[in-house]
Amino acid sequence: MKYRDLRDFIAALEARGELTRVTAEVDPYLEITEICDRTLRAGGPALLFENVKGHAMPLLGNLFGTPERVALGMGQDSTAALREVGELLAFLKEPEPPKGFRDAWEKLPIFKQAMSMGPKTLRKAPCQEVILEGDDVDLDRLPIQHCWPGDVAPLVTWSLVVTKGPNKTRQNLGIYRQQKLGKNRLIMRWLSHRGGALDFQEWQSAHPGEPFPVAVALGADPATILGAVTPVPDNLSEYAFAGLLRGSRTELVKCGHADLEVPASSEIVLEGYIYPDDTAPEGPYGDHTGYYNEVETFPVFTVERITHRRDPIYHSTYTGRPPDEPAILGLALNEVFVPILRKQFPEIVDFYLPPEGCSYRMAVVTMKKQYPGHAKRVMMGVWSFLRQFMYTKFVIVLDDDVDARNWEDVIWAITTRMDPARDTVMVENTPIDYLDFASPTAGLGSKMGLDATTKWAGETQREWGTPIVMDEAVKRRVDERWGEYGIATPPPPPRHSPPSDERGHDDV
């Protein structure tokens, strides 16, 4: 199912029993965070808080609190169907030349659809039904969450930040948190390598002393929101990808203050500028690591115009120790990443980002090993192929007889197939998340690769053990006769068996 806007998605979730309207008064200071956190951990519904203390505007939380709702937001019926999204992205990222006329004819609709999904600009838009300027600009109108006791101030989240570099033909769409400083001032926390920060740096070089235009869209349609966090190929804009997910072109409208365009169906839009040398210390804030981050200085965004729909809905979230909403997003996007990685590395069988690893700091990969040293090639590929894994600190590579998503399997393979000195790869002075205070230098640290695959000739001098596997006929007989044994507990599943084509080093 496709959704025109956020309200369409809310209605669909409510019809499925996936959204609860909370009519009791709730406090945006800490209470909403605790409610959303408990609900998310229980796999509960999206929450529409209709009576937020001190505010007339409702707040939407826990929208993407389950992988299934992420899939629905991307227009898919199940998380398994997200593999199809990944296959589409893999094809668009590196399209293969057609093998013949018939192949070219079959691929033509995909290209035509992708090329026809560029956004279209409207003259009037729902997000501009109400316009506030001058003294009417007041961020206190928004029920901005104060998420954790140690947070310095309320924090704007789920904001789609729209920027455009002076030499760019296409806008950048990024999600950056913003600390509330006053009625019209927010701190724009973007790291130096992110698209918005790069646009700002280019603007400062090309237009020194001039204010940098910025727009922030809150409450866009789910396809546009999720398009901003998906590894979209560089030759495809986030808006075009959102159109592919939605099945219709993304509708935009021009801002009143700057040459920027925002999603027309957004609930709320903030327009303004970053003025030269206007910075402020940001934080501390509770973050996805489960810790409060350090205080750092970032540019200040001055809001000069607020537009919104009639009766707008404020979309919000929180971040904390996993599981949180970003961790759930990462879990769902696992399915998108697999086909993209397999396009470059066909030997990869599965790829998993454990949510307890802060969604991206650890990756578990299973592969069909084909030669000595193959596992090390794959781990290097994970670090280098997609920029989303630039901050991944640990990569564990396993044979395909191991379930990457089962820690019992993974730990068994690590402890039985690894020699720490031989099979550990350490890489120093690599890019690391600035929020990772475990690294010795902010933004720079080390990475570890663990080769937990079966070792082949050339990797070991020893005879490699043969895995213990029960006879299949015996397992079937026990399944059939379990009720005769008089054992009260239900039969456990049989032990996982390695594939029949698994080869040890003696088979080389």
Swiss-Prot record:
GO terms for cellular component: cytosol; plasma membrane. Mn(2+) binds at residues 172, 238. It is found in: Cell membrane. InterPro entries: UbiD (IPR002830), UbiD-like_C (IPR049381), UbiD-like_N (IPR049383), UbiD_bacteria (IPR023677), UbiD_Rift_dom (IPR048304). It is a peripheral membrane protein. Pathway: Cofactor biosynthesis; ubiquinone biosynthesis. Residues 483-508 are annotated as: Disordered. GO terms for biological process: ubiquinone biosynthetic process. It holds the Pfam family UbiD_C. Its EC number is 4.1.1.98. The active site is at 287 (proton donor). Residues 498-508 have a biased composition (Basic and acidic residues). Prenylated FMN binds at residues 175-177, 189-191, 194-195. Keywords: Cell membrane, Decarboxylase, Flavoprotein, FMN, Lyase, Manganese, Membrane, Metal-binding, Ubiquinone biosynthesis. It catalyses: a 4-hydroxy-3-(all-trans-polyprenyl)benzoate + H(+) = a 2-(all-trans-polyprenyl)phenol + CO2. Catalyzes the decarboxylation of 3-octaprenyl-4-hydroxy benzoate to 2-octaprenylphenol, an intermediate step in ubiquinone biosynthesis. Homohexamer. NCBIfam families: PRK10922.1, UbiD family decarboxylase. Belongs to the UbiD family. This is 3-octaprenyl-4-hydroxybenzoate carboxy-lyase. It comes from Chromohalobacter salexigens (strain ATCC BAA-138 / DSM 3043 / CIP 106854 / NCIMB 13768 / 1H11). The gene is ubiD.
